[in-house]
Amino acid sequence: MEHTTTFSIGNEGREVFWNAQHFEPILFTLTAVALAIFAYGLYRRWKLWKAMGKEEIRWDKLPARIKSLFVNGFLQVKTWKDAYPGIMHGLIFFGFFVLLFGAIFDAGEFHITEPLFNWSFLRGNFYLGFAFLMQFFGLCVLIGILLALFRRYVLNPERLGYKGKPDNTADDAIALLLILGIIVTGFLISALRIHVTYQQAPWEWVRFVSWGIAAYALAGVETSTALALHKVIWWTHTFIALGFIAYIPYSRLLHMITT
């Protein structure tokens, strides 16, 4: 799919598959595989729940159920009883929620509104605000994950255990490290792109975390080296993100969907 939009001051934006144009078909294939694994995992869980569960009318008390879904599912009120875990969980949950919708926005423009309606909405001031929010909430998730790792593996409060046994399972570490990997590689991908294209796209300072990495950590890196590193980290980010999706139904991460 060809996208030849020219960006400039007043028409700010970014090229979605920058430095990775030829990877698009492979990415779609791998995404289909990850989604198939995800769907199969959900199907297995559903069969297990159906075999173990009791018949129950789920449409009774609908207003109360909707309220509970909003209060406990979206607002995560139960996690705010204690400050540390409440803040930690809020940073991760709400940050990831915004990043998910950001990815949907990106994909919606690239695959639907641009090719079908010739409409690009991630442009100008809207793009600048969008890019800033993606960096801000990405940073929120990063802080939340670091707080979670510190709490679980340094503080390790007793209530994280079960019946006197520690609850630091490999599943917990995998889940936290996958999310950490997605965020860190996402920042690095943007930083490498900014390092190469900052003269053509000076507005990318709104991606303040990646801009800082590009300005300081990548200062002096040759363009050819940055391009090569970008491809490596782009693929690393892709495999981690798709692995995360595929892993959800087989781990405790499933509670993001079921609670």
Residue ranges and their predicted role:
Residues 2-259:
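Membrane-embedded alpha-helical bundles of multi-pass integral membrane proteins
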